[in-house]
Amino acid sequence: MIIRIVRMHFTEAGVDESLEIFETNKVAIRNFSGCTHLQLLKDADDANCYTTLSHWTDAQSLENYRKSELFGKVWGRVKTLFSERTQAFSLEKFIEL
């Protein structure tokens, strides 16, 4: 399993539009082949900072999503709303208690 974390800082004016984009596309993203979990997290201290947390069955499933028309449509709109460069991480579970 791959855990994907993407931390995004939006312009103040871009927050509402980014939330609309997520709301419109969240079901399609969650139902994309290989996606088993999807969350949007809001930073506790920064109202313009959000993080997506998604689980993928394997790295190829995530890569297929990143090359998909859906990703191109969503990311193409969202990236214009950022106030700074995003931080993205792909992780594997190592130890779980």
Which residues are covered by each model-predicted region?
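Glycine-rich beta-strand-turn "strand-cap" elements at beta-sheet edges
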Residues: 2, 39-46, 76-97
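Intrinsically disordered, low-complexity acidic/polar segments
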Residues: 15-17, 49, 61, 97
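Short, well-ordered beta-strand segments in beta-rich or mixed alpha/beta enzyme
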Residues: 2-9, 39-66
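An amphipathic, aromatic/His-enriched active-site/gating alpha helix that lines ligand/cofactor pockets
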Residues: 27-36, 55-89
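Residue-level marker of intrinsically disordered, low-complexity segments enriched
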Residues: 1-3, 13, 27, 72
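Non-catalytic surface loops within mature trypsin-like serine protease
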Residues: 10-12, 58, 92-95
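Short, surface-exposed ligand-recognition loops at beta-strand->loop->(often short) alpha-helix junctions
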Residues: 9-19
